[in-house]
């Protein structure tokens, strides 16, 4: 058995619909990144991450960097733990509405270019391929991994807060949910 910590990125400098499609962290988010690194480093040695993996997006990479620096490792980038793919025909302005609708339903009800149930499995496989890692990701991808681990169908099964840490054990190649991370008190969209 191996433990995997999946962390939502820190607070970004901008949100959906703003001018920057790939924002980094704001000052609060940068402090959150340092704090979550310290919290992970304070875990017992048998639970402490030894590898750092991130979504390709800047807010995740910047959240991951303090832990990688402290561990003396490079951040491994894996698009499988990235944001939920938006339908190709959807404009950036329409994405928040599409996500709000998706959050109200199940994975198989999401309208788009791909099979989103299969996408949840791809996210889970991505996470599971990094035993002993801290995986920095996104709200929807965290929900995808939790759904895959629990067999859940609801898209927004929980509302992970910025830098909340969701814990999985890896048993025979499968993710087993140990603990969901702290939930947000504010809306994502």
Which residue ranges define each predicted feature?
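Short beta->alpha linker loops
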Residues: 55-59, 137-140, 160-163
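Acidic, low-complexity terminal tails and accessory targeting/binding regions
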Residues: 1, 69, 73-77, 83-97, ...
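Generic beta-sheet signal
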Residues: 4, 50, 129-140
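Internal catalytic-core helix/loop-beta-alpha segment
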Residues: 101-130
């Amino acid at each position: 058995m191996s433990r995997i910590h999946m962390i939502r990125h820190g607070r970004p400098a901008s949100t959906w619909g703003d001018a920057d499609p790939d924002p980094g962290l704001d000052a609060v988010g940068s402090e959150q990144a340092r704090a979550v690194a310290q919290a992970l480093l304070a875990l017992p040695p048998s639970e402490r991450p030894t590898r750092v993996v991130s979504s390709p997006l800047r807010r995740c990479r910047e959240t991951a960097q303090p832990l990688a620096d402290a561990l003396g490792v490079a951040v491994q980038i894996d698009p499988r733990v990235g944001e939920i793919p938006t339908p190709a025909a959807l404009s950036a302005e329409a994405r928040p509405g599409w996500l709000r609708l998706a959050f109200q339903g199940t994975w198989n009800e999401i309208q788009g270019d791909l099979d989103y149930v299969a996408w949840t499995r791809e996210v889970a496989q991505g996470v599971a391929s990094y035993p002993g890692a801290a995986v920095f990701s996104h709200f929807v991808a965290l929900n995808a991994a939790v759904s895959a681990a629990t067999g859940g169908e609801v898209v927004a099964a929980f509302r992970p807060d910025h830098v909340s840490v969701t814990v999985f054990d890896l048993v025979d190649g499968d993710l087993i949910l140990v603990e969901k991370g702290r939930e947000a008190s504010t809306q994502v969209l």
